[in-house]
Amino acid sequence: MNDRKRAVQARVYGRVQGVGYRIWTRSEAAGLGLVGWVRNERDGSVTAWLAGADAAVSAMIERLRQGPAGASVSRVEVEEIETWTAPGDFRIVA
């Protein structure tokens, strides 16, 4: 069994604010057993910080590319985080 842990910061662009993207992200991430946070950015994008099992993080990145109904994702930029301390749950922070 692969229990490798991974953390990433993903920036999601497109029509991702005002469509329930953060609430959807929190629900999807929690369902995959991930911890982290999601927030709106001033430029209209959304940033998500995700940590957990490697396979779950990869699955969540794919889900971010799809987004919830009403969203239209144009691109997702992913940055690997080498050193991290995870919060105990998944939160909407802004």
Swiss-Prot record:
Pfam families: Acylphosphatase (PF00708)
One Gene Ontology MF term: acylphosphatase activity
EC code(s) of this entry: 3.6.1.7
Record-linked InterPro entries: Acylphosphatase (IPR020456), Acylphosphatase-like_dom (IPR001792), Acylphosphatase-like_dom_sf (IPR036046), Acylphosphatase_CS (IPR017968)
Keywords: Hydrolase
SS bond list: none
Reaction it catalyzes: an acyl phosphate + H2O = a carboxylate + phosphate + H(+)
Family: Belongs to the acylphosphatase family.
PANTHER family reported for this sequence: ACYLPHOSPHATASE
Name by which UniProt lists this protein: Acylphosphatase
Organism from which the protein derives: Mesorhizobium japonicum (strain LMG 29417 / CECT 9101 / MAFF 303099) (Mesorhizobium loti (strain MAFF 303099))
Species lineage: Bacteria, Pseudomonadati, Pseudomonadota, Alphaproteobacteria, Hyphomicrobiales
Gene label: acyP
